[in-house]
Amino acid sequence: MKMKKNIFLLTLLATVLLTLSGCANWIDKGQSITSVGSTALQPLVEAAADEFGKTNLGKTINVQGGGSGTGLSQVQSGAVQIGNSDLFAEEKDGIDAKKLKDHQVAVAGLAVIVNKKVNVKNLTTHQLRDIFAGKIKNWKEVGGQDLDISIINRAASSGSRATFDNTIMGNVAPIQSQEQDSNGMVKSIVSQTPGAISYLAFAYVDKSVGTLKLNGFAPTAKNVTTDNWKLWSYEHMYTKGNETGLTKEFLDYMKSDKVQSSIVQHMGYISINDMKVVKDAEGKVTPK
């Protein structure tokens, strides 16, 4: 009787060990990658990663911000699998674009935003440039009320800053002003600061801030697709060389119809497939 009891206990123990071993093997097979960089692209990648995870159990996409410069430098160093950027790698000093592979997954428009108490509705490109250069200091100079202009610029490492400087400022240096890297922080400050102006990815714009037309054109997806709204950039996801494994799976998912036709538009971005023009690393725009 005692022997039968011992055999039963040994069998039970073996079963438990096999079960635990199986669980350990399943856990060991869990995969994860990290995608870091552009805060303008971050909401889209986070939303897509959540949806991807629902049908790919055990596969995790870690998404972090930090800015386009951070994304490019970290993917180049091999610290992360994907570097997110509003910039072409060729535009960033210290980045060897030849060693990186570009995956364009969306287009992001940049809206010019103001505090809601600002009653100006439209600016020309020249007026906007003069504001950020410090030549226009009061809203009354462009048809608004007597209210000092408070500039909130983006950090030097920001892809949005590069897009704005290339498109609006050209060779004109911006005046020294407060700088913020995070889209969310920019929106918060502008919403609370009388006379404030900045620029923000479409995906972050809400009713807490006002938006301006530029040269009579509103900041809409339709105007971006035709380049009537000039402030836009590709959203790049860079890999170091050819993508493999989970990285390839996720990038293929980002380019899939499911993401491009639903998540991209729902999150306030523009699908690559909807663009009527193409832009190169030099900023030259041509019909598609």
From Swiss-Prot:
Has the keyword Transmembrane been applied to this entry? no
Signal sequence, renumbered to the chain: 1-22
Task: Give the SUPFAM superfamilies listed for this entry.
Answer: Periplasmic binding protein-like II
Keyword Transmembrane carried by entry: no
CDD domains named in the record: PBP2_phosphate_like_1
Q: Where in the cell is it found?
A: Cell membrane
> Its topology with respect to the membrane?
Lipid-anchor
Q: Name one Pfam family in it.
A: PBP_like_2
State the source organism's domain of life: Bacteria
As recorded in UniProt, coiled-coil segments are none
Any Gene Ontology CC annotation: plasma membrane
Give GO terms for biological process: phosphate ion transport
What InterPro entries does the annotation carry? PBP_domain, Phos-bd, Phosphate_ABC_transporter
Lipid-substituted positions (N-palmitoyl cysteine): C23
Arranged from A to Z, the UniProt key words for this protein are: Cell membrane, Lipoprotein, Membrane, Palmitate, Phosphate transport, Signal, Transport
NCBIfam families noted in UniProt = ptsS_2 (TIGR02136)
Q: How does it assemble?
A: The complex is composed of two ATP-binding proteins (PstB), two transmembrane proteins (PstC and PstA) and a solute-binding protein (PstS).
* Primary role: Part of the ABC transporter complex PstSACB involved in phosphate import.
Name under which the protein is recorded: Phosphate-binding protein PstS 1
